[in-house]
Every structure is written in structure tokens, then in C-alpha cells.
């Protein structure tokens, strides 16, 4: 049976890639299962994807493997694209402030770069290109 993808997942910079290198095979397998759910389910359960209350537009992908808990920070871009920023292994109930600050910084940087690229494209193609 062919899966139908509703969303795509993209990585911004290398922070998520570096985090991923630290994960065990079992955690990676679980992570890819959660990614598949996120890409194919119309409504994603909060068990797997939840907004970060303190930062507008930022979300956390939630992964549990055994007693280990992991969070991958991300955002939506135009509704159907999920941009991955950085990840952590949670060791306490509270998400570390420095990890949230980093994710917020990366999200702002992503949208600033995107806007710059769109402005450059608009300049190159002229005002009537869209």
C-alpha cells in the first residue's frame, strides 16, 4: 500500500543532524516512526507533536523510547512543511531554557533568511513575476 504524504520534513542548518548522530538505533527507529506519522496523519496527536507554550509558532516533536524522552524543536512553514531545528534528551520535567532559546533563535533566523531569499528572487524576476 502506497502512503500518501500530507507534509514534508526539512532540516535547517546542522543542529538536528548533530543531535541525531548521538541517538541509538532504537531511538532512531522510533524517531522515524514518529516522523512518518507526522508526514501522513491529517490530525497529529499531541502525544507526538505539541506547541511550545512559551514561544509562538514553535513546536516540539515528542519521542519516547523506553524510559528515555527526547524532544525535537520545529515549526511549520506554509502549513505543509515542518522545519527541524535542534533536539534534546529530556532529563527533567522542565525543558531546558537554553534549548528553547536556541530553537527560538533558529526559527527566527530561518524565517529571516527565507524572507531575504524571497526578496532577492522578487528583485531578480521583477515586480510582475508572481
Language-model segments: which ranges?
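Basic, Lys/Arg-enriched alpha-helical interface segments
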Residues: 1-69, 78-82, 90-130
Amino acid at each position: 500500500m502506497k502512503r500518501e504524504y500530507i507534509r514534508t520534513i526539512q532540516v535547517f542548518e546542522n543542529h538536528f543532524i548533530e543531535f541525531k548522530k548521538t541517538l541509538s538505533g532504537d531511538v532512531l527507529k522510533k524517531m522515524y516512526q514518529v516522523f512518518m506519522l507526522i508526514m501522513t496523519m491529517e490530525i497529529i496527536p499531541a502525544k507526538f507533536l505539541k506547541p511550545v507554550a512559551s514561544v509562538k509558532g514553535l513546536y516540539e516533536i515528542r519521542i519516547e523510547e523506553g524510559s528515555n524522552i527526547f524532544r525535537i524543536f520545529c515549526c511549520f512553514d506554509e502549513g505543509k512543511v515542518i522545519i527541524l531545528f535542534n533536539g534534546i534528551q529530556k532529563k527533567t520535567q522542565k525543558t531546558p531554557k537554553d534549548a528553547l532559546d536556541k530553537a527560538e533563535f533558529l526559527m527566527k533566523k530561518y524565517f529571516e533568511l527565507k524572507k531575504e531569499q524571497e526578496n532577492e528572487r522578487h528583485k531578480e524576476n521583477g515586480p510582475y513575476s508572481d
